[in-house]
């Protein structure tokens, strides 16, 4: 990325001009919204609505959704201190979260939820099916990187749009999911995939 920055400065041009010029006037972005409970989340959603934000990623209990689904009393005996996720409770709570959000704010906002690859693939299928009635813009990182083959099961069993890729590192991880149309949105960090050049190759794959 630094080399592209140097090239742009030497040419006296922003990178988008080096790449051939801009192709759109703007792009939608989402903001993260959380809260200690449903009411606080809806208050925060209203705040973003007034700012003109149209896409929101919703979690309950703070960034990443903690303590939603947290059940430390079930931690294995002798386990390290920390947070332990009850997948079944997390699924129930998340479905209830979006049910109540839609009941309170309607369907004008585009909503996103990030699973953070924290549940088993079979549970991800159950969660996705449970969230279908609430018209999510996408469900992000529903399966772990090591189990991407489960995206086929998701595609076959649910209509919810899927985003994946936050932890992608190399082309072998995204070629199949793109070629087989197993996801609707690819979500990568440019620094994670190797910089601007690999990201451009991914864009035109």
Predicted regions and their residues:
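Metal- or metallocofactor-binding catalytic centers and their adjacent structured scaffolds
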Residues: 1-13
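Alpha-helical scaffold segments in soluble metabolic enzymes
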Residues: 5-6, 17, 47, 100, ...
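Anionic group-transfer/hydrolysis microenvironments
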Residues: 7, 59, 116, 142-143, ...
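Ligand-binding pocket scaffold of soluble enzyme catalytic domains
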Residues: 10, 28, 32, 205
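Short, flexible active-site-proximal loops enriched in glycine and acidic residues
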Residues: 10-22
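Secondary-structure boundary/capping positions in well-ordered alpha/beta enzyme cores
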Residues: 14, 108-109, 134, 161, ...
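Metal-dependent enolase-superfamily TIM-barrel catalytic cores that perform enediolate-based chemistry
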Residues: 26-27, 31-157
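Catalytic alpha/beta core domains of metabolic enzymes, predominantly
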Residues: 146, 150-151, 155-205
